[in-house]
Regions:
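Residue-level signature of outer-membrane beta-barrel architecture
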Residues: 75-77, 112, 139-141, 154-156, ...
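Outer-membrane beta-barrel "beta-signal"
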Residues: 159-174
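Membrane-embedded beta-strands of outer-membrane beta-barrel proteins
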Residues: 71-73, 108-110, 135-137, 165-167
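Short loop/turn motifs that connect adjacent beta-strands in outer-membrane beta-barrel proteins
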Residues: 24-35, 78-86, 117, 142-148, ...
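Transmembrane beta-strand segments that form the barrel wall of outer-membrane beta-barrel proteins
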Residues: 86-96, 117-128, 146-156
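Residues that define the transmembrane beta-barrel architecture of outer-membrane proteins
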Residues: 63-69, 102-106, 127-133, 146, ...
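Short glycine/proline- and aromatic-enriched beta-strand/turn motifs that initiate or cap beta-hairpins
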Residues: 23-70, 170-172
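Cleavable N-terminal export/targeting peptides
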Residues: 1-31, 174
Length: 174
């Protein structure tokens, strides 16, 4: 009887001492970060009020359709292999090169991408016509380690609205 009481007391003591360790949450592994930076090319349609503002305030004369060339710096953060992932990207563009002008644009977008490649993002945009909020959506097609994004963006501002379509490529690397 004494042995069973001692075993019971020892078991209760061990269980009591280990309870704090057992109640600790399981820490998930750190998120994988993948760089998906690469060149971008496309076009932007400018509202007439944007064209007028560029001419009046910046002495830049362009047609309402301008080319876009640039680079997208992108990081994708994996949270799970089966669910959506968080994405942050910085897009630097020069517009109007086809018309002999260089109109800079900088956007920083924060968004989400599904496992199938659909993506949505929002963030600030800065151009010579002012600061605005960019809304973007698109899809990324994958071929091995190469990604080919096709994105559509709308930037409404006090000066007017800009609508862009961009594509490019990136290679998946950690």
């Amino acid at each position: 009887m004494q042995i069973s009481q001692r075993l019971t007391a020892a078991a209760l003591l061990i269980l009591g001492l280990s309870t704090p360790a057992l109640s600790q949450p399981i820490v998930p592994p750190p998120a994988d970060v993948v760089s998906l930076s690469g060149p971008r090319v496309g076009f932007t349609v400018l509202s007439q009020s944007i064209v007028d503002t560029l001419k009046k305030d910046n002495q830049i004369t362009v047609a309402p359709l301008i080319s876009q060339f640039g680079w997208q710096f992108e990081k994708q953060f994996y949270s799970t292999q089966t669910g959506p992932t968080a994405v942050t990207e910085c897009v630097l563009l020069l517009g109007g090169l086809d018309q002999g002008v260089a109109i800079p644009s900088l956007s920083w977008l924060v968004g989400v991408r599904t496992r199938e490649g659909a993506e949505f993002g929002v963030g600030p945009n800065i151009t010579p016509t002012g600061v605005a909020l960019a809304l973007a959506a698109g899809i990324t097609f994958r071929a091995g380690t190469m990604n080919v994004p096709v994105n559509f963006a709308v930037v409404p501002s006090k000066s007017g609205t800009r609508v862009s379509v961009l594509t490019g490529f990136s290679l998946r690397r950690r």
